[in-house]
């Protein structure tokens, strides 16, 4: 049984379901999708043909993004990629748009930054990797500011920004979840920002159901595994997920694909009631105050907006680790080193 989600979350879930099939709504929206596709194609062509100039910031950029709307697992992928690049001998930094943050100029994000000023994903990345992280809607400005502040950085990972064509990049990685391209239609008739045929260097598929990978070139499985939960008010307290099995548990997530979080918990032996909150939910007030559960499990991305000052002793945070295929890491490293030696 699921706890009742908010109106906005239900509307998002309904639209997501519609995007998985070619129903009446999808077909009715195809004229708008055609217009969207034409505009997007013109933007891509403008940079591909040199009508508009790409900006090389003097440091190779690896873009981790998606061609679909909604969460696919980019943030844990960025964290894992930063760790892998560091292990390969690079000194990585990260740039992001800082969704929801009040930013107009390039801004550094540290583990102590406020989520309202940094954005939840950049703050989580800064805390998990301790790498230099800068945010700005203008990715070029963000990369330049990061490089000026940290000249030792020799590769920049862009958290999203696939459609920010102005920024020159050395590697593009597109991340999908189990829904892949949905009904195959462009926005607003479907979930696609760009056609599935869009060129990229590698594809990651984050499918908790472990189905066969699509037959695309350089496609790799992305595995997300949960770690022990930690207590929001007392982070030093740890608890294996299996120990929640006999408790009344609510799982809540304000991320792009909350069902993926719920599926991860079920696979670990937890059978929670579920609440899908709107993506980037602000947690201005405690949405759990009237809920009667022994424990409430939330994502790390949501936890950065709460802090340890929240007095709800039922809240536990479930961290997620991404396991990257060694062949993907080798592909990225080869392209980066080839660019450096060119």
Curated annotation (Swiss-Prot):
It catalyses: a lipid A disaccharide + ATP = a lipid IVA + ADP + H(+). Disulfide bonds: none annotated. Its EC number is 2.7.1.130. It is an enzyme of class 2 (transferase). Pathway: Glycolipid biosynthesis; lipid IV(A) biosynthesis; lipid IV(A) from (3R)-3-hydroxytetradecanoyl-[acyl-carrier-protein] and UDP-N-acetyl-alpha-D-glucosamine: step 6/6. SUPFAM superfamilies: P-loop containing nucleoside triphosphate hydrolases. This is Tetraacyldisaccharide 4'-kinase. GO terms for biological process: lipid A biosynthetic process; lipopolysaccharide core region biosynthetic process. Belongs to the LpxK family. The keyword Lipid biosynthesis applies. GO terms for cellular component: plasma membrane.
């Amino acid at each position: 049984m699921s706890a009742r989600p908010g109106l906005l979350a239900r509307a998002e879930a309904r639209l997501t379901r519609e995007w998985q099939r070619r129903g009446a709504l999808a077909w009715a929206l195809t004229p708008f999708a055609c217009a969207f596709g034409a505009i997007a194609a013109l933007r891509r062509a403008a940079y591909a043909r040199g009508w508009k100039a790409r900006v090389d910031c003097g440091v190779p950029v690896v873009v981790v993004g998606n061609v679909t709307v909604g969460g696919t697992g980019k943030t844990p992928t960025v964290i894992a990629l930063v760790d892998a690049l560091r292990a390969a001998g690079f000194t990585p930094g990260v740039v992001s748009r800082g969704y929801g943050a009040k930013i107009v100029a390039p801004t550094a994000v540290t583990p102590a930054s406020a989520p309202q000023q940094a954005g939840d994903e950049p703050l989580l990345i800064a805390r998990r990797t301790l790498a230099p992280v800068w945010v700005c809607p203008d990715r070029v400005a963000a990369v330049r500011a990061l490089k000026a502040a940290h000249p030792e950085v020799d590769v920049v990972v862009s958290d999203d920004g696939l459609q920010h064509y102005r920024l020159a990049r050395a590697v593009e990685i597109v991340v999908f979840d189990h829904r892949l391209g949905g009904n195959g239609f462009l926005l607003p008739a479907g979930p696609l920002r760009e056609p599935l045929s869009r060129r990229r260097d590698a594809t990651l598929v984050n499918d908790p159901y472990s189905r066969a990978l699509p037959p695309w070139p350089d496609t790799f499985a992305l595995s997300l595994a949960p770690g022990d939960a930690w207590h929001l008010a007392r982070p030093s307290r740890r608890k294996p997920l299996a120990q929640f099995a006999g408790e009344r548990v609510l799982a809540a997530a304000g991320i792009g694909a909350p069902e993926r979080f719920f599926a991860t918990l079920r696979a670990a032996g937890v059978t929670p009631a579920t609440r899908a909150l709107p993506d980037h939910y602000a947690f201005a007030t405690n949405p759990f105050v009237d809920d009667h559960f022994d424990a409430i499990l939330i994502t790390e991305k949501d936890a950065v907006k709460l802090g340890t000052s929240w007095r709800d002793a039922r809240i536990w945070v479930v961290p997620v680790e991404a396991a990257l295929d060694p062949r993907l890491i080798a592909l990225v490293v080869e392209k980066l080193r080839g660019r450096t030696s060119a």
